[in-house]
Amino acid sequence: PPRDTAPTNFKILVPVMANDLSNAAAAGAAGDVVELRLDALSILDAPNVQNVLCAARAAIGQGVPLLATIRTKKEGGLADLTDAAYGELGTAICHSGLADLLDVEANTAPAAITLPRLRPPKRWSTP
């Protein structure tokens, strides 16, 4: 059955490329969630990712959820990472406390990431 898409349940996600945060504040004002595409960074390591997450959080404020995404080349993104490096970055993002959500690639993550479960997963209910 189709999901309830009434206006009260509908959310707008606005993507922002991490190599250009100039529009991050506008994205935070325009959407319900800001997706930060970290795979656009020229230096894709934990310290740089943390610095960019801090800058993005400062730009969009605390009231808007921040979704961190690292899309690998094999999934159509820009990041050329091994599964181990992908897992290390995902774990660093999770532990940083700077992102509210982490986009995990289904074809990469099971083999690469063991993220701590910070809270029980939400279960989708069907009508």
Language model feature labels by segment:
Residues 1-23:
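N-terminal amphipathic alpha-helix/helix-capping segment at the start of soluble metabolic enzymes
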Residues 7-9, 71-73, 120:
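Generic N-terminal leader/processing signal
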Residues 8-12, 30-32, 62-66, 98-100:
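Short, well-ordered coil/turn segments that N-cap beta-strands
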Residues 15-17, 33-44, 86, 90-127:
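Catalytic beta/alpha-barrel core
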Residues 20-32:
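N-terminal segments that cap or nucleate solenoid repeat domains
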Residues 21, 75, 126:
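Flexible, glycine-rich phosphate/dinucleotide-binding loops
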Residues 24-27, 52, 112-115:
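A short acidic, amphipathic alpha-helical/loop segment
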Residues 47-98, 108-110:
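N-terminal active-site wall of soluble small-molecule enzyme domains
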